[in-house]
């Protein structure tokens, strides 16, 4: 039932490992692109919601954030949160090793960070209207995220990436417009529910840092958020999705390494 999709994920893990090993610059550029694409989505949703009544903000923000994952998947780039799922399937299927997985994940995260900060810098240099005003939703949301309790961030991170990886998983199981519908629904649920995505937070934090933020907003708070959200994102991508669908597949139907072709799939 899930064998074909797992095969695609494991083959993509092998592609990611080859790209990282054979073309490190290309891998870092592609990772930065993913961070930038998610950042563009963050700028969009905060621009749209800044002047809205708080009661409708979650719906508007959720309904428009689908652009972020659409850009990542359709344009092609390397997103940390998607890699947590892809690389887990790769390890279980034997297309990559544990060592490769744990070497690639931090590189992807750092590459995403570069792209996220770069987009925030461009927005700031372009006179970003959200940044100079200390009452902007960017500053209030960023501060709230950096002061939230660790376990709240961890579990919100887990719920978030469960939805993100489900969106990616479903794009591999559908064709045509159904891919976009899957992305839209999952990201609507993630944003409207107030969950935490480490890469999306990177651009938000950079935007607030470059603007007229509160003195209570600190680098230590940013690090606190990104640590716990990243761990939560990793849990759901690797365990809930990767191991979950692996063990949901009958043992006789699970793929083995020699079945993989080297066809590239959407990076996610």
Please provide the spans of the model-predicted regions.
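Alpha-helical transmembrane segments and their helix-helix packing motifs
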Residues: 1-268
């Amino acid at each position: 039932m899930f064998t074909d999709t797992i095969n695609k994920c494991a083959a993509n893990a092998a592609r990611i490992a080859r790209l990282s090993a054979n073309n490190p610059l290309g891998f870092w550029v592609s990772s930065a692109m993913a961070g930038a694409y998610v950042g563009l989505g963050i700028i969009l949703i905060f621009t749209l919601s800044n002047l809205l009544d708080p009661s409708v903000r979650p719906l508007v923000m959720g309904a428009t954030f689908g652009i972020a994952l659409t850009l990542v998947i359709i344009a092609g780039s390397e997103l940390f949160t998607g890699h947590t799922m892809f690389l887990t399937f790769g390890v279980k299927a034997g297309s990559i090793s544990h060592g490769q997985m744990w070497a690639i994940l931090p590189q992807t995260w750092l590459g995403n960070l570069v792209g996220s900060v770069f987009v925030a810098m461009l927005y700031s240099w372009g006179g970003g209207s959200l940044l100079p005003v200390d009452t902007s939703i960017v500053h209030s949301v960023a501060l709230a995220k950096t002061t939230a309790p660790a376990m709240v961030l961890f579990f919100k991170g887990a719920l978030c990436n469960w939805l993100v990886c489900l969106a990616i998983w479903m794009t591999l199981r559908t064709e045509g417009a159904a891919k976009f519908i899957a992305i839209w629904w999952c990201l609507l649920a993630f944003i409207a529910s107030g969950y935490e995505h480490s890469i999306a937070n990177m651009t938000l934090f950079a935007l607030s840092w470059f603007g007229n933020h509160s003195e209570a907003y600190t680098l230590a708070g940013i690090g606190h958020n990104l640590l716990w959200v990243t761990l939560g994102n990793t849990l759901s991508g690797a365990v809930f999705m990767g191991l979950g669908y692996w063990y949901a597949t009958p043992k006789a139907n699970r793929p083995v390494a020699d079945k993989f072709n080297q066809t590239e799939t959407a990076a996610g």
